[in-house]
A protein has these predicted regions:
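Local sequence-structure signature of Cys/Sec-based thiol-disulfide redox active-site neighborhoods
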Residues: 1-35
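Short amphipathic alpha-helices and their capping/turn residues within compact interaction modules
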Residues: 6, 19, 25, 29, ...
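Beta-strand cores of modular interaction/reader domains in eukaryotic scaffold and signaling proteins
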Residues: 7-10, 35-38, 63-65, 70-71
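Amphipathic alpha-helical protein-protein interaction segments
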Residues: 10-13, 38-42, 79
Length: 111
């Protein structure tokens, strides 16, 4: 079984989920890449959402987990990004499971 340090629990139609996915998947280069679980398209979506609520105290989506710890939802991911704290948060919580995290625009500037 493949271990993924960053998992985004989402619903395909949710604007907050779209924003979090856009930041994590398009704005950042994260290795290994985050795994997205679309709860509205998953056969066990309702059960997973209930389990997330029980384990993280958060029933709403998106719910972004790093090594099993919730860092919050769309507003939280946006705030971490705007404060330039998202990469360090992912690295700190991801530990040995996160090989690389950087903003794609910063990577281009460095080249």
């Amino acid at each position: 079984m493949l271990y993924c340090a960053v998992v985004i629990f989402s619903k395909s139609y949710c604007p907050y989920s779209k924003r979090a996915k856009s930041i994590l998947l398009e704005k950042y280069n994260i290795v290994p890449a985050p795994h997205v679980v679309e709860l509205d398209q998953h056969a066990m979506g309702q059960q997973l959402q209930s389990l997330l609520a029980k384990n993280t105290g958060r029933r709403t989506v998106p719910n972004v987990l790093v090594n099993g710890k919730s860092i919050g939802g769309g507003d939280d991911v946006t705030a971490l990004d705007e404060k330039d704290e998202l990469a360090s948060t992912l690295k700190n919580l991801g530990g040995k499971w996160i090989q690389e995290v950087n903003r794609k625009d910063q990577k281009k500037q460095a080249e």
